[in-house]
């Protein structure tokens, strides 16, 4: 008998070009390959309605997101309230199939569905209130800082009040443990993120520069780059390339003032892949302990040495594949040591074992199917 699953996504998951939709797109693809029929529900606010999604979905439903003051509530986070479209609830109530909610964002109709004894599963992208607290600390714009702080406070209460019997599927072991121990959600488990990579493509030998890549329009990533410029590459005198989407004018000016450093704005997919492959060291610190860092997974599958701080890998299972520095001085020292050190078979073998055990889309899809049915 065929199995059908509703999936609610906070955004249109194609192109799969950022963390929140990479996991969903490749999860959807893996479920389809296991014979699951998917009814996709997503909120369209600028990414269009791509035909690509029809390859894996029995049906695709698009909804408008309410924005501005109409989505402001004194009890529900904005990211949730703005997606409380009644058309979505109407479509979900047309049958009795289980529902996978992709992120806290998509939980507006959680309780009405549970009251009807529907099987509901929540995919947790981050511990959202902690993530928004980190965004508050990284943001410079006063209006955005106020928004992130308020949203973090609302999310803290909202996440704590989620039903205790709700199965929660976290993308990192740390997040699963936090939900279990701090929020008393006993059904929280770790389900690894679904990824686009099926095999390692790391070049042996020595590359020619250090690389940081990421969405540079995100305040958290700009903070990481600024920290690297001020604290790390002022000590490690080696070529440093920063590549990513929409860097601010402020960041571009800062990079230009730093010797041995350059910035590549909005590289194409091919250009970014080439940069990742040719780098000697991927320097990818984070100041956010929650979630999983997909840019680090990209570097581990397709690049040479990876240097990180504790926050970037804690609870991820990726610690053994990375060089970890606890301070800026330690990271600079590791970079200096590795810059002329060839990347070879031993490191590749370690990554094959570590990554292959964890990020297996087929096995993880089968685990998800067993959980749901």
Residue ranges and their predicted role:
Residues 83, 342-373:
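A charged, aromatic-enriched C-terminal amphipathic alpha-helix characteristic of glycosyltransferases
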Residues 26, 87-93, 128-131, 139-168:
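Membrane-proximal helix-turn-helix segments that form the acceptor-binding/catalytic region
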Residues 67-76, 118-154, 215:
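Acceptor-binding helix/loop patch of EC 2.4 sugar-transfer enzymes
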Residues 295-301, 305-309:
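Short hydrophobic beta-strand element within catalytic cores of glycosyltransferases
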Residues 1-58, 94-96, 234:
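N-terminal subdomain of nucleotide-sugar transferases
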Residues 277-291, 302-305:
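Acidic donor-binding loop of glycosyltransferase active sites
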Residues 148-200:
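Donor nucleotide-sugar binding/catalytic pocket of nucleotide-sugar-dependent glycosyltransferases
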Residues 23, 190-257, 262-277:
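Conserved catalytic-core segment of nucleotide-activated headgroup transferases in glycan assembly
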């Amino acid at each position: 008998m065929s199995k059908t699953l509703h999936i609610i996504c906070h955004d249109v998951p194609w192109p799969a070009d950022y963390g929140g939709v990479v996991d969903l797109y490749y999860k959807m693809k893996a479920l389809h390959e296991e014979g699951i029929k998917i009814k996709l529900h997503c909120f369209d606010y600028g990414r269009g309605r791509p035909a690509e999604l029809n390859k894996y979905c029995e049906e695709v439903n698009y909804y408008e997101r309410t924005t501005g003051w109409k989505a402001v509530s004194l009890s529900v986070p904005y990211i949730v309230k703005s997606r409380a479209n009644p058309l979505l609830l109407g479509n979900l109530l047309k049958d009795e199939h289980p529902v996978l909610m992709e992120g806290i964002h998509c939980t507006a109709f959680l309780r009405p569905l549970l009251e009807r004894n529907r099987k509901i599963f929540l995919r947790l992208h981050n511990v959202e209130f902690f993530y928004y607290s980190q965004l508050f600390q990284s943001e410079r714009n006063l209006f955005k800082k106020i928004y992130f702080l308020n949203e973090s406070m609302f999310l803290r209460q909202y996440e704590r009040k989620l039903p205790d019997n709700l199965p929660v599927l976290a993308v990192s072991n740390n997040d699963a443990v936090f939900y279990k121990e701090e929020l008393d959600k006993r059904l929280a488990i770790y389900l690894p993120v679904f990824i686009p990579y099926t095999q390692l493509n790391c070049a042996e030998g020595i590359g020619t520069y250090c690389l940081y890549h990421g969405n540079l329009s995100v305040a958290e990533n700009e903070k990481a780059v600024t920290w690297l410029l001020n604290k790390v590459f002022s000590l490690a005198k080696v070529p440093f390339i920063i590549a990513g989407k929409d860097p601010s004018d402020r960041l571009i000016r800062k990079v230009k003032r730093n010797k041995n450093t350059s910035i590549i704005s909005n590289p194409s997919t091919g250009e970014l892949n080439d940069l990742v492959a040719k780098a000697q060291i991927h320097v990818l610190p984070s100041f956010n302990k929650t979630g999983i860092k997909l840019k680090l997974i990209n570097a581990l599958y397709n690049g040479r040495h990876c240097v990180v701080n504790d926050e970037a890998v804690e609870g991820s299972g990726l610690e053994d594949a990375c060089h970890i520095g606890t301070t800026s001085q330690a990271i600079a020292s590791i970079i200096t040591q590795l810059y002329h050190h060839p990347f070879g078979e031993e490191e590749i073998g370690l990554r094959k074992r570590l990554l292959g055990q964890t990020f297996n889309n087929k096995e993880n899809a089968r685990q998800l199917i067993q959980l749901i049915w």
